[in-house]
Amino acid sequence: RHSVEQIITAYGMARELGFDNINMDLIIGLPKETSEDVRATMEEVKKLGPDSITVHSLAIKRASRLHLLWEEYKDQTGRDIDAMAEVTANTAREMGLEPYYLYRQKNMAGNFENVGYAAPGKACIYNILIMEELQTIAACGAGTTTKLIFPAENRKERVENVKDADQYVERIDEMLERKEKMLTIQPLTAGKKAQS
């Protein structure tokens, strides 16, 4: 967990260090959240002035605590999601940010989508490549997933790290070995050529 103050401090430090393309991610449709809550959040975001924002409609993951407590929260989640999405789109426009990518996930609040907004020239190519699954990604840390893309074979391979941070630290050698093995895998076509 982090606080609003920690976000503001981290953002300020990043700017002081010279970062000139900062994205902020927001989740809308949280339990008990209203469009007025989202409006207040967006006003704070506007004060900071990030170069891009990504607005995620809440997607309930199967392994999440919210999924386990769904019966308790289902009537309080995403009730006003269309108004929330409108608030974020309008504020992004006021900030001079334009939509540059959109993607959907399973189990999204209100059956909405995630939208990336960016200032001209500040679109995050990484986000586009990730969503289109066009780029190999080597991920580090607990709960992350490395994904290898083999475009010539229309094939993707994934290696997930353990989610628990303590387990990740205890098993770091295993995690590194799995990743190294995956990153040195030759495409299937290379193996077929060698056999011919």
Positions of PLM-derived features:
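Radical SAM enzyme core and accessory elements
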Residues: 116-196
